[in-house]
Every structure is written in structure tokens, then in C-alpha cells.
């Protein structure tokens, strides 16, 4: 059977590459929001949903328009993928799997995706991304399978890359016929039916004082200033470690 697997690593971009990634993520956010706005206008006029094929022609139109020619500086594939994300959001809404698509806010969950054109050099811990060039990453494990797509995202002030691969694996056959029960709790992380007990990690308690100190420092900063943003990223990184 075929198995899809994701490998996530922290990127180590240069200063210019980081600026470009922010710009690409902003362009994808712009395309998604502008297409959603046009879909809303179309719906208010009493017309049916416009599929991806037509939305792709909007992207060509926007690239040629004087006020949005800056979209040409971003790679085409991630911009197209943002339109496919919007199409997927509408399909999930029509099938009652999700709420109606909402506008994205720049700076929150920044991400963009490459379906192809990526080169992976695991031996030297680097990856090639169109219009970004070669970039190093923290190589913590071997990537196996055929690369299907690559997603670049930002979290807690750092950039990450998620490589999705496809590989052929044999169907697993469990040799045992016995079963075991598991009870998850708060005081005890897990208790097995054979009496084995796993204690809690208590990562929050270990970092509670540090978190309180950082939050006090944040309250003294001028909201939305550079120092406030830096302090907020420190808190986000600590929350990431706790999780």
C-alpha cells in the first residue's frame, strides 16, 4: 500500500531569503483573500461558485494589472496553490465538513506550498526552492519516499519546512492476538490494564515561573512596538516547548 508521510525541519535562511519568504507568504495571502472577495461578490449577485479553472485566469489578470504587477515577483506555483486551498475550503463547506471560508490575516499562520520544482540534498542538509535558491535546514532524520510537495511555514518567529513524501509499504500484520487497555488521565498520563503506569510530563509546571516572568515583561512593553513583538515571540517559543 502507499503511505503519505510528512517530515518537518527548521529552516536556516539567510536575511534576504527570510525577507523573500515573508513576501511570498504575503502574496499568497493576498491572492486567497482577493479571490474570496470576488467569490463573495459573485454569490451576492446570485451566481454559482466559480471553480479553480476560472480563478486561475484571475491570477493571470492580476499579474498583468498595473497595481498588482508585484505578484510576478513571487513564484507562480505557491500562488496557484493558494487558489486550490480556497477551492478545497469551498468543497469542504459544500459537503458540510467545515464553515464558510474566511479571509486570512497576514502575519498569522504564514505559509506557502510548492507542488514541484524542489531539490533535496540530504547529504549536505540543504533544499532548493524556486526563487529562493538553496537553503540549509536542521537535518534531524532521513527523508524517505518520493517528494510530493513542500510547505514553508512560520511559527513562533522561526521558519519551518514540511516535506510530504509517498512511499510503498507492505501492509502490517500484527503477530499478537492479545489486547491491552489504556486509560488516559490528568494525575497519571496513562495506566495500562496490566498495571503499568506512565507519569505526567509536567512540562507546564516546569516552565510556569518562566512563562509568568515573560508575560509580565510583555505587559510593560508598548503594544505592537518592536520590543513588544520580540517579547511576544519569546512567549510563543516557550509555549511551543511546553506543548
Feature-to-residue mapping (PLM):
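Nucleic-acid substrate recognition interfaces
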Residues: 1-243
Amino acid at each position: 500500500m502507499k503511505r503519505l508521510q510528512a517530515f518537518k525541519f527548521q529552516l536556516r535562511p539567510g536575511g534576504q531569503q527570510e525577507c523573500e519568504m515573508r513576501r511570498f507568504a504575503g502574496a499568497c495571502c493576498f491572492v486567497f483573500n482577493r479571490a474570496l472577495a470576488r467569490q463573495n461578490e459573485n454569490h451576492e449577485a446570485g451566481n454559482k461558485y466559480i471553480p479553480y479553472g476560472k480563478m486561475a485566469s484571475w491570477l493571470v489578470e492580476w499579474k498583468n494589472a498595473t497595481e498588482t504587477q508585484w505578484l510576478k515577483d513571487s513564484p507562480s506555483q505557491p500562488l496557484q496553490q493558494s487558489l486550490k486551498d480556497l477551492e478545497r475550503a469551498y468543497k469542504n463547506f459544500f459537503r458540510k465538513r467545515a464553515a464558510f471560508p474566511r479571509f486570512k490575516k497576514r502575519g498569522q499562520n504564514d505559509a506557502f506550498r510548492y507542488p514541484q520544482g524542489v531539490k533535496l540534498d540530504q547529504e549536505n542538509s540543504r533544499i532548493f526552492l524556486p526563487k529562493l535558491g538553496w537553503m540549509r535546514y536542521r537535518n534531524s532524520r532521513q527523508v524517505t519516499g518520493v517528494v510530493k510537495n513542500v510547505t514553508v511555514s512560520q511559527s513562533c518567529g522561526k521558519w519551518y519546512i514540511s516535506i510530504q513524501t509517498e512511499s510503498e509499504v507492505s501492509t502490517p500484520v500484527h503477530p499478537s492476538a492479545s489486547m491491552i487497555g489504556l486509560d488516559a488521565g490528568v494525575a497519571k498520563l496513562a495506566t495500562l490494564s496490566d498495571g503499568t503506569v506512565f507519569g505526567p510530563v509536567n512540562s507546564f509546571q516546569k516552565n510556569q515561573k518562566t512563562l509568568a516572568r515573560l508575560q509580565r515583561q510583555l505587559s510593560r512593553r508598548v503594544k505592537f512596538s518592536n520590543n513588544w513583538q520580540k517579547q511576544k515571540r519569546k512567549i510563543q517559543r516557550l509555549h511551543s516547548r511546553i506543548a
